């Protein structure tokens, strides 16, 4: 029997009485986001809206973005990816379970040095899927656009991982699963974490280094395997 979404007590700043909100809304207030389902327009719009709000509320505190998703729409994934690049704050992306297809694309789009995986998580790279069906004319037009988007995504993967675009194209032609070590070597992530407390240390390192003009990727990459 499903237990539903748990509710927890939360007191809105300035209010004297606590109210009960679902656990995800409570975590949003702590700048923690979850992608735990198929990525469609509705889910993407919710995530984008929360990121815009958190960035406008405080552009000095980072966002932690947990991912356990089979992926989804190319347009939705590109929207979330673009927002991560657009906002001022750092976005730490964390794979737990599985980040497949466009979910792995979002994982790779996190702030450099802050793209993480738990030890038993997996990422999966493959060719993003497009829609089909309808009249022949529109199917041809859609096919051209799908090919354009796939090529765009391949180039962005290459940019985020440092892999040659030719290798990205080949690897996207089949389901390509990777454990943390392989994902790090490939460039999809920067670091494997074994305990959630490591996030605090990582955030402190990044915050300290930003005061000197940037994140020391070499130092962060040496932490873990």
Curated annotation (Swiss-Prot):
Principal location class: plastid
Cell compartment(s), UniProt: Plastid, Chloroplast stroma
Cited Pfam families: CLP_protease
SUPFAM superfamilies: ClpP/crotonase (SSF52096)
Highest taxon, organism lineage: Eukaryota
Cellular component, GO annotation: chloroplast stroma; endopeptidase Clp complex
EC number(s) from the headed UniProt entry: 3.4.21.92
Molecular-function GO terms, alphabetical: ATP-dependent peptidase activity; ATPase binding; serine-type endopeptidase activity
Alphabetized Gene3D superfamilies for the sequence: 2-enoyl-CoA Hydratase, Chain A, domain 1
Catalytic activity: Hydrolysis of proteins to small peptides in the presence of ATP and magnesium. alpha-casein is the usual test substrate. In the absence of ATP, only oligopeptides shorter than five residues are hydrolyzed (such as succinyl-Leu-Tyr-|-NHMec, and Leu-Tyr-Leu-|-Tyr-Trp, in which cleavage of the -Tyr-|-Leu- and -Tyr-|-Trp bonds also occurs)
Keywords, ordered alphabetically: Chloroplast, Hydrolase, Plastid, Protease, Serine protease
GO BP of this protein: protein quality control for misfolded or incompletely synthesized proteins
Record: active site: 101 (nucleophile), 126
Complex and partners: Component of the chloroplastic Clp protease core complex.
Function description: Cleaves peptides in various proteins in a process that requires ATP hydrolysis. Has a chymotrypsin-like activity. Plays a major role in the degradation of misfolded proteins.
Family classification: Belongs to the peptidase S14 family.
Protein name: ATP-dependent Clp protease proteolytic subunit
């Amino acid at each position: 029997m499903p237990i539903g979404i748990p509710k927890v007590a939360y007191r809105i700043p300035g209010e004297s009485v606590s109210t009960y909100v679902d656990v995800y809304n409570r975590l949003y207030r702590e700048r923690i986001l979850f992608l735990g389902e198929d990525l469609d327009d509705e889910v993407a719009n919710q995530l984008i809206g929360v990121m815009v709000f958190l960035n406008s509320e405080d552009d000095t505190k980072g966002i932690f973005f947990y991912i356990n998703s089979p992926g989804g729409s190319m347009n939705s994934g590109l929207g979330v990816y673009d927002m991560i690049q657009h906002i001022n704050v750092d976005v730490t992306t964390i794979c737990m379970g599985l980040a497949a297809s466009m979910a792995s694309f979002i994982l790779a789009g996190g702030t450099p040095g802050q793209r993480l995986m738990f030890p038993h998580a997996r990422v999966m790279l493959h060719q993003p899927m497009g829609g089909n069906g309808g009249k022949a004319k529109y199917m041809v037009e859609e096919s051209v656009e799908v090919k354009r988007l796939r090529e765009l995504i391949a180039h962005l993967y290459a940019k985020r991982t440092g892999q040659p675009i030719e290798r990205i194209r080949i690897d996207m032609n089949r389901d390509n699963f990777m454990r943390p070590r392989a994902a790090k070597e490939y460039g999809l992530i920067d670091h494997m974490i074994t305990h959630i407390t490591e996030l605090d240390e990582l955030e402190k390192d990044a915050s300290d280094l930003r005061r000197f003009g940037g994140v020391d990727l070499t130092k962060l990459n040496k932490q873990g395997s």
